[in-house]
A protein has these predicted regions:
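Proline-centered loop/turn at the N-terminus of a beta-strand
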Residues: 6, 76-80
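Conserved phosphotransfer cores of two-component systems
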Residues: 45-48, 70-76
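Acidic, metal-coordinating helix/loop segments flanking the phosphotransfer/catalytic sites
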Residues: 35-52
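Two-component/phosphorelay signaling modules centered on CheY-like receiver
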Residues: 14-33
């Protein structure tokens, strides 16, 4: 049996967080699911995670600002931003962005396959 890949999942919407974490745990991922941005930042800095997923679920909520803070923290971790609300401006800090309510688990899993293959380290200036 292959070891599971440790990833972080952050979403302020607890129902969406729970459903997404459940689906990801059925795959080869060891998911740390967090609904608090401070805890997410602490886990990102302290843990040996391979990748992080940040989900913005509701338009106009404060979670969007918190996600921007997490993205700007330069955590040297490949990050996938799933902007289901569609109201975050183009974000240059995320390694990959999926926009819109129609983002499916298939899209997220495909993006994770790409990001988990990347090495941890500083992002390029490009």
């Amino acid at each position: 049996m292959r070891p599971k890949i440790p990833i972080l999942l952050y979403c302020a919407d607890r129902e969406l967080l729970s459903a997404t974490a459940f689906a990801l745990r059925l795959q080869p991922y060891d998911v740390t699911a967090i609904d608090d941005s401070r805890s997410a930042a602490a886990v990102m800095m302290a843990s040996d995670l391979v990748c992080g997923i940040l989900i913005h679920a509701k338009q106009g909520d404060l979670a969007g600002r918190l996600i921007h803070r997490l993205l700007e923290a330069d955590l040297h971790l490949p990050l996938l931003l799933v902007d289901r609300a569609g109201d975050l401006a183009p974000v240059r800090y995320a390694d990959m962005v999926l926009y819109g309510r129609n983002t499916s688990m298939t899209h997220i899993l495909g993006a994770l396959n790409v990001l988990c293959a990347r090495k941890r380290g500083p992002r390029s200036a490009a």
